[in-house]
Amino acid sequence: MALTLASAADLLKEHHLLREIIQGDVWTDDPARIASADEPFAGITYDTRKVTPGTLLCCKGQFKAEYLNGIDEAGLAAYVAETEYSAATATPGLIVNDARKAMSLLSAAFYGYPQNELTVIGVTGTKGKTTTSYFTQALINAVSGGKAALFSSVDNCLDGHTYVESDLTTPESMDAFRMMREAADNGMKYLVMEVSSQAYKVDRVYGLTFDVAAFLNISPDHISPIEHPTFEDYLYCKRQIIVNAKSLVLGADSLHADLLREDAEAAGIGVTTFALHDADNAGTSADVVAWPADPAHASFHIADGDQALGDYHLSIDGDFNYLNAAAAIAIAHAVGVSLDDADALHAIESVRIAGRMEQFRDPQSNTLAIVDYAHNYASVTALLDFVYERWGEENPRITLVTGSAGNKAYDRRKEIVEAAENRIANFIFTAEDTDTEPIIDICMEMQGYITNKDVVSTVISDRLTAITNAIYDARAHADRFNILLIIGKGNERWIKDHRKHVPFDGDDHVVERMFGL
């Protein structure tokens, strides 16, 4: 059914969001008093620059009346907002208590509730969301004939095989429902999507129920005035995925796992757990468990209870990725994938993600470069754990090339330093994404957190120069085994600066070019 002003008003009333409808001097609760109430909207947008004849505009966030200049001439049909703009437009306004919640509900309705045509899987956690999501999509694609779509912080995939770079971990609600509609129209039957804490903080997934929610882990992150004021708020927002799910897959070793189980019990949903053990039966009890198959940790056994699921050798290094693999298998099983389908389960082995644990060897020196998205205490610690487990006996000289995001997650700056300073030889602080905060200020702040007098630190604000200098420095110490950890940006081809995406080669391409690969 097409979305009209009348049906939009009814939907908003149902969710106790509609305050009134205003058009000029008409203030009403009855859409029948508006002449155009039964005319279907031709489009929906939250960007005034994209308004065309028949469009419903959602005014959210820091919306300003001046954005409406010339909007009637563009063909605006109606708007949704928390305040009325009768002085700027002659079109009717649906005045609501919460514009973001309203936008999510109306977007779902406009696109014909595409989530009802998909089995929707939500993946949240402080670390591992992207890798787990890719593993899950690969596994489900293997059994469904490529019918799994993906929304991730790296790429979106709406047809099971074509990947396009994404902008947000969880898209704006309107974009999410538009992409769901496209995925469903492309014949997709499943959707795997990363769900950030901000998605619940700002209602990007309001009204969406997940067939399966995966809660991987939790540790402090995203604490800042513009994200979450406290860890409690961060965790509370993350927990909302459980309230809005039909089934939960839970990391058995997650902090506050007991609280998360209580949430699931209160919601009346079942829980499937997963865990990583040091050896068979040497760890927290869980339904799906991974543990090393050999002393070198080159492959891992995975089992579901008493059912052995085989040995796995992933294309992405790191023991923690076998934990992500166990999570993906638990998720797939929760949506009905048979654990007897060995070919499907082993589809995770071939998954590679650009910018995730990518390794490059320098032909000119004994240097290994690892490009990864690690960007907080937990992920930097996990990365260094992997390095020491794999190469610790070779006494590597480790250089960390890092920055930290501007204008948010301020605690990360100190935490990255704390995670690394007693385990590396050198820091090179450099550019990462920022809005208005100067890159050099962020780098200097991070340098100021160093307490280990033996670690060397340098600030090189230009990221290309920072990576280049790290490589030249490693070559100058060719008598040592050098490991360069270049973190935070992965394969992203831009750096955000003053709200603009400035073109950048990508850490992986810079390393490949310097190494002559």
Swiss-Prot record:
Gene3D superfamilies: Mur ligase, C-terminal domain (3.90.190.20), Mur-like, catalytic domain (3.40.1190.10), MurE/MurF, N-terminal domain (3.40.1390.10). GO terms for molecular function: acid-amino acid ligase activity; ATP binding; magnesium ion binding. It is an enzyme of class 6 (ligase). Keywords: ATP-binding, Cell cycle, Cell division, Cell shape, Cell wall biogenesis/degradation, Cytoplasm, Ligase, Nucleotide-binding, Peptidoglycan synthesis. It holds the Pfam family Mur_ligase_C. It is found in: Cytoplasm. The keyword tRNA processing does not apply. ATP binds at residues 125-131. Pathway: Cell wall biogenesis; peptidoglycan biosynthesis. One of its GO terms (biological process) is cell wall organization. UDP-N-acetyl-alpha-D-muramoyl-L-alanyl-D-glutamate binds at residues 48, 169-170, 196, 204. The keyword Protein transport does not apply. Its main location: cytoplasm. InterPro entries: Mur-like_cat_sf (IPR036565), Mur_ligase_C (IPR004101), Mur_ligase_C_dom_sf (IPR036615), Mur_ligase_cen (IPR013221), MurE/MurF_N (IPR035911), UDP-N-AcMur-Glu-dNH2Pim_ligase (IPR005761). GO terms for cellular component: cytoplasm. Its EC number is 6.3.2.-. Carboxylation is probably crucial for Mg(2+) binding and, consequently, for the gamma-phosphate positioning of ATP. The modification N6-carboxylysine is found at residue 238. Catalyzes the addition of an amino acid to the nucleotide precursor UDP-N-acetylmuramoyl-L-alanyl-D-glutamate (UMAG) in the biosynthesis of bacterial cell-wall peptidoglycan. Belongs to the MurCDEF family. MurE subfamily. NCBIfam families: murE (TIGR01085), PRK00139.2-3 (NF001129). This is UDP-N-acetylmuramyl-tripeptide synthetase. The gene is murE.
